[in-house]
């Protein structure tokens, strides 16, 4: 039990540039399109936008009507040559690839499900995507522009699964709490998914019952309680939702194709059921192995007769998941076991019978990518001709491990979100008469559903939430319960002192922190007692930020301290040397960065005292680093009374502090007049 007493006042794990998104040839696409039918144009195009594109993308009204009738003649698909197939399935681009805008195969099941039950199943899809009420949409967009949300608090679970949610809807009046979904029986699923969903997902636990209405109701979700234990369930649930959305969209296009084919020439029928480009789902993942796990989830929820390029995919993306011993933390093994390369992007195309991997982006329904890999794809080629039009019609983003993305370069994530749902620079064979009005009006960022899963929430993730998760359907932020904090569960019996320094501004916080460290922490280290047989001072200085690490390291160059340093950029030989010299007492100090610990989880020996230059965002890092001291006590290298932990913090680290000291104490730490707080 811990008691508080107031005493006084960017690494990137890189590989050679990927080319998956451009490696598929038109002939490969033709092979999997043998049962597809194009979403044909209606008679009226969206004239205003068409003027912004080259005239090569426009066609005469007469030609468009004739094309609609000709393309719907019954032609045996197996007799279609590649050239004919290209003319049916899309307009060839300048690079020779074929772009098939929302061209989906004829699906008998679409007709089979066209009854009252199917209409009931599509209510959420209909309301949010297919046919939103224009007046309500305008009202909610106005509320979002004014940043006015009606909020309500949600609580669920108990014990270690207890959590809290804040549901925000862009309306003036408070909404009734959403009805919890108890199982997949309560979800609006396409019939093709029901059986597998019942077998693989089944009933929801208490936490899932709280977040499922937001997921399947097309609201944004920031889930800040992802764990190794619930990761697989969250993956299955989000993949089920993504598949359901693709099937809903495909069947809607097929039905409207049939209506257009049956309509007389003198009837100006209009069915707006598409976006500018085909890709609808974007999975932002941390490693290639995570991509394999998502694909496995998709294929167990939807059975495909054929999976094209599966062996090629597994050869490139999958590795055995047993390269670390059991003594490594579970979250570390989950993230880095298997293929941990983090520069990749790959398109996936779904037809009724086939899942095709390595489809070109413009022919894909789903894009799997890391933030780094996707940014590289956008920036490849001529800097003046960056291509991000394939992201213009993304309707669902699922970011699976945002906390791990933070440990890479978060700017890549910001870059990707800045390039979502922009008006395309080129037509890419788009039929504007089929494009939904809210796409044309530039409202897609507020219709897109964004699901972010993270082990915890940080200021950067909060910024993403506030800036890019502004859905007209609403948004839910869910966090784990930190009432007691991590410190309640620690049993090392070591004195842990939290010291607050004055930091007037968030912008000047790094300067204030360094000043406090130089004027208070370093002098206190020089006063530590030195004994002959102690094996050195054994002071580990944990520095979350690499920039702060460089600053501290440079300040020690001309000092009297003997020190070693380990960062994410330190090579293996120098790491071994630094650890050995620190353990043997040759170096009194060891500078250790947060990202070095994230990527390697070193078990460092010889640690007798710890100074946290800043509060770790990941509370597990605090536990593990304090545990270094605990192990030194067990080995009788230092007494419990001599061992110490000192944490430097400012009022700007409230979120990080809360996860460690608990919600019930964090207010005192950041607001009390005293600035030193001891925990035992």
From Swiss-Prot:
Its main location: nucleus. GO terms for cellular component: nucleolus; small-subunit processome. Residues 18-39, 76-85, 105-117 have a biased composition (Acidic residues). The keyword Cytoplasm does not apply. It is found in: Nucleus, Nucleolus. Component of the ribosomal small subunit (SSU) processome composed of at least 40 protein subunits and snoRNA U3. PANTHER family: ORF PROTEIN-RELATED, U3 SMALL NUCLEOLAR RNA-ASSOCIATED PROTEIN 25 HOMOLOG. DEAD-box RNA helicase-like protein required for pre-18S rRNA processing, specifically at sites A0, A1, and A2. This is U3 small nucleolar RNA-associated protein 25. It comes from Pyrenophora tritici-repentis (strain Pt-1C-BFP). The lineage of its organism: Eukaryota, Fungi, Dikarya, Ascomycota, Pezizomycotina.
